[in-house]
Design a protein with these regions (language model features):
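C-terminal, surface-exposed recognition/capping segments
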Residues: 251-285, 306, 326-334, 361-472
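Short, intrinsically disordered N-terminal pre-domain segments
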Residues: 1-17, 26, 470-472
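Short hydrophobic/aromatic-rich beta-strand motifs
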Residues: 17-24, 318-320
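GGW-centered surface loops in extracellular recognition modules
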Residues: 40-117, 124-125
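Acidic glycine-/aspartate-rich tracts in secreted/extracellular proteins
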Residues: 24-28, 52, 121-123, 160-162, ...
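Extracytoplasmic, non-cytosolic globular domains
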Residues: 310-337, 349
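Short, surface-exposed terminal/edge motifs of secreted or surface/virion proteins that either
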Residues: 22-40
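Short aromatic-cysteine micro-motif
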Residues: 108-112, 138-322
Length: 472
């Protein structure tokens, strides 16, 4: 290597990838320090959407270097996570392997097969006269903004979880034994085309799912709302698109950023209703060998005696099949039906492992009131309330499956009573499904063949109340 004089060095544009060499006198170690930690200028990146513009596509803002590498810096991808929240990264190219080498045990013996991030970060949502913004910052909160703290966390990497029928635990595993039989645990189907071995567990009420999730220990959840909110927000920020069902585009834009979405969602079998009785039809092992892949997957199933290719399975850095397959009723969202045939969303701000009361809105935080309905059906709002890490459509209609947020909200047009919030959409939901799809028609005690659960966990308890960061 040739010697270079200091005065001959070119200047650098400081960004998320700029580091200094530092020495820790106490530890006796030399390492890299992000310039932002020294300068106080935290890297942040996000997207903005023009008010009044119906396009779901946003514009990038902030540090483009961070935008190009956000998934890598957050550590998005597959992990093995123990009940004690110790996580081991899986190989980015094949989840059958550990990142460090060697085979990965996804059957439950070494932990849960999860997807998530391995560093905490901060999320900001705000607006000015012209734009609505969603941004994330690394290393600390953004000064001059309300900040939401997001701890290290994860969810079922296969999209949904299985039930350990022996121990009544909700687990993220890929296991074909009877102990983890999916669906409603119907043993009579074993060996048939519609066997539920290695399938997601379904047809359980959310109260049963969340109780089974907590059998893993503290800070384990089922269909926890913040996990879905942040997954959706990261997709919007990384893709720059509110329509996650947009066609996948492997080509980066002129700024080196992702664009498009991960497609409409999974295909259906020939007779999901008559032959499958609406139970799961794609195994939990789909896409494992693709690692932290982003794009579209496919698999082949025995469709009542015929080999059928099931395509359009979405994958987001290894998170598979997380919308338009099985509904997932949230364990900590509650809808109050109003006299004018609208609904109001309530949540709990404490993500500490306690179980939110699903029989009363007393003591809960009101998020917002949705649109009025003349009759039960799907509605599309122009704007969404994004508050306390919860989402809900605002009152003004005028959106569609290709404009604004693009996802549907099913309003039962009921005038009283409480309802649960069923998220993600089902395989029959078509273009109404997606990251902020919400069906508000079912009682919280409801359970059907096409309702499942994604297992969630966080490394620490936190609140969904934002904190203001004072400017220097």
């Amino acid at each position: 290597m040739e010697k270079t004089l200091m005065r001959e060095l070119e200047g650098l544009n400081v960004g998320a990838n700029t580091y200094l060499l530092g020495y820790d006198t106490k530890a006796g170690k030399t390492g890299l320090i992000a310039v932002s930690q020294v300068s106080g200028s935290l890297p942040w990146f996000g997207r903005k959407w023009a008010k009044g513009n119906s396009s779901p596509v946003g514009s990038p803002v902030g540090d483009f270097d961070l935008g190009q590498t956000l998934a890598k810096q957050l550590g998005l991808g597959g992990y093995l996570v123990t009940d004690a929240h110790v996580r081991t990264k899986l190989s980015a190219s094949n989840h059958n392997l550990l990142e460090s080498g060697g085979a990965a045990d996804l059957t439950g013996g070494a932990g849960h097969y999860q997807w998530g991030w391995n560093v905490p970060f901060y999320y900001q949502v705000y607006e000015d006269d012209n734009y609505l913004y969603e941004t994330v910052s690394l290393g600390g909160p953004r000064p001059g903004f309300w900040n939401y703290y997001i701890p290290v966390g994860s969810r079922s990497c296969a999209g949904y979880a299985a039930m350990d029928r022996t121990n009544s635990k909700l687990m993220s595993v890929v296991n074909s034994t009877a102990q983890f039989r999916g669906g409603n645990n119907d043993a009579s189907l074993d060996g048939l085309f519609n066997s539920q071995l290695c399938m997601p567990a379904t047809n359980m009420a959310i109260s049963a799912f969340r109780t089974a999730a907590r059998k893993n220990g503290t800070l384990w959840f089922a269909n926890e709302r913040v996990m879905q909110y942040i997954t959706a927000a990261l997709k919007r920020i990384i893709f720059g698109n509110r329509n996650i069902q947009a066609t996948f585009n492997a080509t980066l834009d002129t700024n080196g950023l992702r664009q498009g979405g991960t497609g409409v969602g999974i295909d259906q079998p020939t007779a999901w209703a008559d032959a499958w009785k609406y139970y799961p039809y794609v195994k939990l092992n789909v896409g494992i060998d693709q690692g932290d892949f982003t794009g579209i997957l496919n698999t082949t199933i025995n469709d009542n005696g015929t080999q059928k290719t099931i395509g359009n399975i979405p994958s987001f850095y290894g998170l598979k099949n997380d919308y338009k397959y099985l509904y997932a009723m949230s364990e900590n969202m509650l809808l109050q039906c109003n006299a004018d045939k609208s609904q109001t969303l309530y949540v709990s701000d404490n993500i500490d492992g306690s179980q939110m009361n699903l029989s009363s809105v007393a003591g809960l935080t009101q998020i917002g009131k949705g649109p009025v309905a003349s009759a039960a059906g799907w509605q599309y709002a122009k704007e969404y309330t994004l508050k306390n890490l919860a989402f809900f459509p605002k009152e003004e209609l005028g959106g569609s499956t290709s404009t604004y947020f693009c996802d549907g909200y099913y309003n039962p047009a009921a005038t009283s009573g409480l309802r649960g919030a069923a998220l993600l959409g089902g395989a029959l939901s078509g273009v109404a499904a997606g990251s902020v799809c919400l069906d508000g028609s079912a009682a919280v005690s409801g359970a059907t063949a096409y309702w499942g659960a994604f297992l969630c966990e966080y490394a620490e308890a936190f609140t969904t109340q934002p904190v203001w960061c004072v400017e220097d």
